[in-house]
């Protein structure tokens, strides 16, 4: 039983949250092979600065983050890229739950790049992972997820919560079969189509729209308990 774990985006609270990931996710699944694939935004010249000046509780760029990732994740493949701006002048955030459009596109680009590394590894080795997991570096699980193979992997497993609209899905953590997750995570490549189909321009609305309306994927909502590191009490 093989699991692909995808990390992406800014390495927020990576070092603080990793012991929690180890205890609540890696340990309950340590009898399985867990391979990490990651696409991370990283720019040496930003070391010491906050990820987002407006929100200092989201952490800083640190000099040893790259080394930490390679040592602790032992990734099958990892790609570091300097943050970049995405052109999207005609895409407007939904005013009910606004989120900077560049951040939205950047998030889904990074997720797509991590998943592309996974797909390339599958193609090169002529197999499919039994399960693919998308996880933020700054997630803090308040109770263990448990053994992954006890879940229905012919469905996208997500958090049971209301995420803005009926089709909205919490965008921090999800898993399912490799084939289903390839569709769940293909937002960046199809961003314009998804927007033109009527998705609200907000991360949780877009990923949920892509899964439940565009692809009509089976989705299972689970009573997990987790928060972002910055929100933990």
Give short role names for the model-derived ranges.
Residues 1-19:
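N-proximal low-complexity "stem/linker" segments adjacent to membrane-targeting elements
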Residues 11-15, 45, 140-142:
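Short acidic, S/G/P-rich loop/turn micro-motifs used as interaction or catalytic elements
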Residues 18-22, 119, 142-153:
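Short alpha-helix within the catalytic core of nucleotide-sugar-dependent glycosyltransferases
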Residues 20-33:
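Short, acidic, metal-binding catalytic loop of nucleotide-sugar glycosyltransferases
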Residues 39-128:
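Active-site-proximal specificity loops/subdomain of glycosyltransferases
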Residues 100-127, 140-144, 162-233:
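Catalytic core and acceptor-binding pocket of nucleotide-sugar-dependent glycosyltransferases
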Residues 132, 138:
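Short aromatic/hydrophobic "clamp" motif used to bind/position activated sugar donors
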């Amino acid at each position: 039983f093989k699991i692909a774990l995808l990390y992406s985006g800014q390495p927020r609270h990576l070092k603080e949250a990793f012991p929690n990931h180890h205890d609540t996710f890696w340990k309950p699944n340590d009898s399985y092979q867990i391979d990490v694939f990651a696409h991370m935004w990283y720019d040496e010249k930003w070391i010491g600065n906050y990820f987002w000046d407006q929100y200092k509780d989201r952490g800083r760029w640190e000099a040893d983050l790259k080394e930490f990732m390679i040592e602790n994740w032992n990734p099958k493949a990892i790609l570091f890229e300097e943050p970049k701006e995405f052109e999207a002048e005609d895409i407007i955030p939904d005013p009910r739950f606004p989120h900077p459009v560049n951040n939205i596109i950047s998030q889904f680009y990074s997720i797509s790049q991590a998943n592309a590394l996974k797909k390339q590894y599958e193609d090169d080795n002529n197999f499919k992972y039994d399960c693919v997991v998308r996880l933020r570096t700054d997630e803090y699980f308040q109770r263990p997820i448990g053994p992954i193979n006890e879940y229905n992997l012919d469905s996208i497993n997500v958090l049971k919560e209301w995420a803005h609209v009926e089709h909205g899905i919490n965008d921090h953590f999800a898993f399912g079969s490799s084939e289903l997750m390839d569709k769940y995570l293909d937002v960046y490549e199809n961003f314009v189509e998804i927007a033109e189909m009527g998705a609200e321009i907000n991360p949780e609305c877009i990923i949920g729209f892509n899964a439940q309306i565009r692809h009509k994927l089976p989705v299972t909502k689970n009573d997990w308990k987790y928060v972002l590191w910055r929100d933990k009490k």
